[in-house]
Amino acid sequence: MRYKKYFRKTSLKQKGVGDFFLDQIQSKKPRVFLEVGVFHGVTARNVCELLYSIHGNDFNYIGLDLFKESDEINSEVIPNTKFNNPLKTIYFNYIRRINPYSVEGVEYLLKKFKKNVSLIKGDSNKILKKIDMSKIEYVFLDGGHDYLTVMNDLNCCYEVLINNGIILCDDYDLSYAPGVKKAIDEFTFKNNLKCEIICNNRFAKIQKI
């Protein structure tokens, strides 16, 4: 399945990266998927389309995000939520009249899978501790890039690995957010986990040895 952008912003926009990502999900075929860092929901829609093609309606997607504008968050590294393309700005502001980076905006994009999707607004440092990880099979971690946030997110998702699931972390090689790599390296070393650095050092794929 090819990765589609759905006329929105996505952090997996570089050529081939989205397709590579979907191939990773395809190889595992999870029924319960958690994404930390939903952004405009493009990756969420692609994941739902893929899981539907594999399992029909027998899948669940859980998405967690702050759902705040980039200029509202000074302490974190997140993608710019503003469009560079004026046509997209006009479409969402004046035609669709919806903020694509909002719970409502993402729900609109995912309405086809309304019964399969749960969106949670909040800080992963607080919310992840409340999520039952026992049934989650795959985690895509692309939330806060601060060292402490990444470490918190990894620790909270550790049960997924114990149950033979996978955590795929984005931005392992992001030079202006070194806390991502530092947290992943320390977490995998401490817990004696297998960590593959893939897609030209972009993703860190973590699982049990």
Show where each model-derived region lies.
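S-adenosylmethionine/decaboxylated-SAM
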Residues: 2-11, 15-209
